[in-house]
Regions:
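Terminal accessory carbohydrate-recognition/targeting modules of carbohydrate-active enzymes
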Residues: 1-168
């Protein structure tokens, strides 16, 4: 089973309910520059990890071509999809809620993580986006580079912009 959210321009976010990119058209953020078929896979997937009291747990899910896999679904306690997809994970006394939304009429996606730490231990969340910036169905170009622009912090949230090959 998969979720699908759209932006009204032909862009979308669609992965399995566990957050894996299992099909060729899966992407966390697929932008559309010209409807209906000029789509670019901007962010393939997210790798998510929480460190609690010095021990790290990957709670993202993905199976790779070489047979290796991330089994974050083992920590997934709930997935719901009313207006937006929401995931809840429980890891050693820490609850993590993730919600993704797309802005209508724009090639923009936002994701929010809420970490409720019920332990007295230090917890640190790390998220690694797997950027592609490639046409839908195409591989990343050899030598492709990315440039990161920092934005100021807004209401306690970090923001920024990534650019590659004229796409941003």
């Amino acid at each position: 089973n998969c979720y699908l959210i759209t932006n009204g321009l032909g862009g979308y976010s669609s992965l399995t309910m566990t957050g894996a990119a299992a099909r060729g058209d899966h992407a966390f953020f697929m932008a559309c520059t010209e409807a209906p078929n000029h789509r670019y896979n901007m962010i393939q997937r997210l790798e998510e990890q929480i460190t609690v009291n010095g021990k790290s747990y990957i709670f993202s899910t993905q199976e790779y071509a070489d047979g290796s896999r991330q089994e974050g679904y083992r920590y997934l306690s709930e997935f719901s999809f009313e207006d937006t997809p929401v995931w809840r994970f429980h890891i050693n006394g820490v609850e993590i809620e993730k919600e993704a939304v797309m802005r209508q009429g724009e090639n923009t996606i936002a994701v929010c993580w809420r970490v409720m730490n019920r332990t007295r231990s230090y917890a640190c969340l790390a998220v690694t986006p797997y950027f592609r910036f490639a046409e839908k169905g195409q591989d990343i170009c050899a030598g492709q580079t990315y440039k990161r622009y920092e934005a100021e912090e807004c209401s306690g949230y970090s923001a920024g912009r990534i650019e590659s090959g004229g796409l941003s």
